Amino acid sequence: LRVAGLIESAQSGPNPCKSMELRSLDGGHRFAISQNLGPGSQACNLHPEGLALACAEVEQSIARGADVVILSKFGKQEALGSGLIDAFSAAYAADLPIMTSVSPAVMSEWRQFAGDLAECVTPDTAAQDSWLDGWLQDCMIGMRTHDRIGYPIARTITA
């Protein structure tokens, strides 16, 4: 199973804002996506360059060949057309299933992006395992997700 994607992790530190990074599931590379804006800053500390580099890595993984894409979340940045939206789009264009999480705050934007291909899965291990098992069975019998009418290509884990 060739997995492309990114997972997010946050480290607590002395600053009130957490230090965030994305880790590539393909190569294990780590991308800092937050920046220190100095003491007292109330601005968003998202680091666009780190996000762009991480997104490009996923796109390259998809181009090399992937079976499934896992992206940490479809959030505010993606809803605005930035962030990891190009990675989502590359997976969609390659007819690859996507597993991600979506905040209720941007669910309408997610549904607009994914259309009828999205299916919400509850955020528990059993539901996610069931989705993955079903997808793997389809692959074993030679079916791609887009060959099955009505079979969602994107799975959403909702809070």
Predicted regions and their residues:
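Walker B catalytic acidic pair
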Residues: 73
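Helix-adjacent hinge/juxtasegments
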Residues: 27-65
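A charged, well-structured terminal subsegment
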Residues: 123-159
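N-terminal phosphate/diphosphate-binding loop that engages ATP/GTP or pyrophosphate donors
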Residues: 1-39
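Glycine-rich, charge-decorated loop segments at or immediately adjacent to ligand/cofactor-binding or catalytic sites
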Residues: 104-118
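Substrate-engagement module of ASCE P-loop NTPases
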Residues: 87-104
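Conserved acidic residues
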Residues: 67, 118-119
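Short Gly/Thr/Asp-enriched flexible loops that form oxyanion-binding sites at enzyme active sites
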Residues: 79-89
